[in-house]
Amino acid sequence: MSALLAAAAFVALWSTGFIVARAIHPYADPNLYLLARFGGTALLFAIIALASRARWPARREWGRQLLAGALLQGVYLGASYWAVAQGLPAGVMALLGALQPLATAVLAVPLFGERLPARGWSGMALGVAGVALVLAPKLAAPGATATAHGAAGASAFTVLVAVLSIASITAGSLYQKSAVARTDLRTAVALQNAGAALVAAAFALALGETHWQPAPTLWLGLAWGIAMLSGGAIVLFVWLLRHGGAARATSLMFLAPPLAALQGYWLFGETLGALQLAGFAVALAGVALARWSR
């Protein structure tokens, strides 16, 4: 598989998560949706693994795979959704998410001996700046007051949970470089989604989530989430982590908010201004520097 093709496909798929979350919001509570999505992907890839006779890891390794999935998807998405529901503005959550590639790059130095050259760190800085430019209009309107009050209104515990979600996906990304990397991708994705499903179930029970209103939009969003987000995108991301540096792989996430802004413009008629387009260009330049610096 070409690394460039895998990177492009991953970004295109992963960015749709923002759109799916918005589309299914009126029809299902977030963790119920995530439980169905993770469980569906786990079942799908278990069937694929069995049909293709993929080698399953030893039972003693299953716990590691479950933990990897719980960190990479379960805690990350469940905690971030909860933080937004508690009053943390979505734009602030997205800005916190932009720090994840930076955290991964910093931690990859002592853990794996990965070292980004100066151009790579410059690319990371550009990536964060690009995301900030893309999100700037949403953080400032309808008036900076609303967003500022939303951020200020979020409790310290809510902010802590949001930071925990970013720490979770960072840990999950780095953990993919450990012993779990030896497991066949098909069985790894099945087990890791099972781990994420356990977390989503715990969140749904703890928060008393019960809302599920069957609708074509919900079923379409669930099918896309099963096959393309927790399936295809995770396969590509784990492959990129296994076959390259953790910092270079996670730097691709800088492009998710800009692409989501484009998708919001096409699908929902959201405003897309010159500042956001400039942010897209800056983020793209940053990812190019981070990924292909030597």
Placement of each model-derived feature along the sequence:
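Specific transmembrane alpha-helical segments of multi-pass solute transporters/efflux pumps
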Residues: 13, 17-18, 46-97, 133, ...
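Glycine-/small-residue-enriched transmembrane alpha-helix faces in small-molecule transporters
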Residues: 1-35, 41, 142-178, 198-199
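Helix-helix packing/entry segments at the starts of transmembrane helices
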Residues: 11, 34-36, 92-99, 174-198, ...
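Membrane-interface helix termini and inter-helical loops of multi-pass transporters
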Residues: 19-28, 82-86, 135-154, 205-222, ...
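Hydrophobic transmembrane alpha-helices of multi-pass small-molecule transport proteins
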Residues: 45, 107, 116-139, 147, ...
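C-terminal transmembrane-helix exit sites in multi-pass transporters
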Residues: 44-56, 84, 100-125, 258-278
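Cytoplasmic-side transmembrane-helix entry/capping segments in multi-pass membrane proteins
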Residues: 7, 60-69, 116-129, 183-193
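Transmembrane alpha-helices of multi-pass small-molecule transport proteins
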Residues: 26-75, 101-103, 107-108, 167-172, ...
